[in-house]
Amino acid sequence: MGHRLPFLVVLVLAAGACGTPEAPRASSSSPVQVPAVSLSTLAGDHTELARLADGRVALVSLWATWCESCGKEMDALNRLDATTAAGRGAVVIGIDVGEEPGKVAEFARRRGLRYAQLVDEDFAFVDALGQRRVPSTLVVDRHGSIVFRGDALDGRSLEALRRAIAAGP
């Protein structure tokens, strides 16, 4: 047993290091803000996510045209934007990662995406987040703080969106 204890300690420490990183949580002392990075619009202009959200709660979906899982979420995001987000001080925003705006615009048109789209052509936004994985979902409160980060659109992200909307101004 004496030889096993150091091995077990190393094994437990290694297993703990392999977990996914903790999602950023907004706190009164040090909220994690959305990166102030310039993103392309589908028309080729530039803006920042905070400017597009304009003081509204935002559900942000990071995606790519080649991502099959991302495509499965898009119909749900269209419905969410048309029902839950509309009229409640919230907005759904898609951010394509690593592609050029013309390609993304054509894809969005073919897919019938009605929610706002931005493009992170040079990975500056996702690199500032420390997260290149797609699909990924963020919920951003009215003050630009990231209050939820997850791998995909699911019950946890929808609950975070509901809480952020309910929190009011």
Describe the function of each predicted region.
Residues 1-40, 148, 156-163, 168-169:
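N-terminal targeting signals for export/organelle localization
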Residues 37-58:
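A short beta-strand-turn-helix
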Residues 54, 106-113, 121-166:
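Thiol/disulfide oxidoreductase modules built on the thioredoxin-like
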Residues 59-60, 92, 137:
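Hydrophobic beta-strand anchors of alpha/beta hydrolase catalytic cores
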Residues 56-58, 62-66, 133:
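Short pre-active-site segment immediately N-terminal to redox-active cysteine/selenocysteine motifs
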Residues 61, 94-96, 148:
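Soluble periplasmic/extracytoplasmic beta-strand elements of cell-envelope proteins
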Residues 71-111, 121-127:
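Structural microenvironment flanking redox-active thiols in thiol-disulfide oxidoreductases
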